[in-house]
């Protein structure tokens, strides 16, 4: 039985079989969790869809995983700060409206 995509083509995209398996598993989990696909698929299974994306070059191993982790943490912090700022503005607006209501 011939695998599609070919293991040889896939190994050209990653440094080792281990890396291929890890990348495929992570991407399959992302797809199963509702991540946006990068292309149209001929397969219905998430594991095969992940392999199709790897073969096409749409999914790669990040060259600097630590930088990727730092960027992800930074995005979380920025989102939290934005939410706190929004909450602060809402509280100020409520206090202002309450103060204006007390004047009437």
UniProtKB/Swiss-Prot annotation:
Gene Ontology MF term list: DNA binding; DNA-directed RNA polymerase activity
Listed InterPro entries: DNA-dir_RNA_pol_omega, Pol_omega/Rpo6/RPB6, RPB6/omega-like_sf
Gene3D superfamilies in the record: 3.90.940.10
The entry's keywords: DNA-directed RNA polymerase, Nucleotidyltransferase, Transcription, Transferase
Documented EC number(s): 2.7.7.6
Catalytic activity of the protein: RNA(n) + a ribonucleoside 5'-triphosphate = RNA(n+1) + diphosphate
Keyword check for Transferase: yes
Cellular component terms (Gene Ontology): DNA-directed RNA polymerase complex
Gene Ontology terms: biological process: DNA-templated transcription
One Pfam family this sequence matches: RNA_pol_Rpb6
Described purpose of this protein according to its UniProt entry: Promotes RNA polymerase assembly. Latches the N- and C-terminal regions of the beta' subunit thereby facilitating its interaction with the beta and alpha subunits.
Subunit structure, as described in the record: The RNAP catalytic core consists of 2 alpha, 1 beta, 1 beta' and 1 omega subunit. When a sigma factor is associated with the core the holoenzyme is formed, which can initiate transcription.
Family classification: Belongs to the RNA polymerase subunit omega family.
Name of the protein in its database record: DNA-directed RNA polymerase subunit omega
Upper lineage: Bacteria, Bacillati, Bacillota, Bacilli, Lactobacillales
């Amino acid at each position: 039985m011939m695998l599609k995509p070919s293991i040889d083509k896939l190994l050209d995209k990653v440094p080792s079989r281990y890396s291929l398996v890890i990348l495929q598993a992570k991407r399959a989990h992302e797809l199963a969790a509702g991540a946006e696909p990068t292309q149209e698929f001929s397969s219905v299974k998430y594991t095969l869809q992940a392999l199709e994306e790897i073969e096409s070059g749409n999914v790669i191993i990040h060259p600097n995983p630590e930088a990727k982790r730092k960027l992800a943490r930074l995005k979380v912090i920025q989102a939290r700060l934005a939410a706190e700022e929004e909450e602060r503005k809402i509280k100020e607006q409520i206090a202002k409206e309450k103060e204006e209501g007390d004047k009437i």
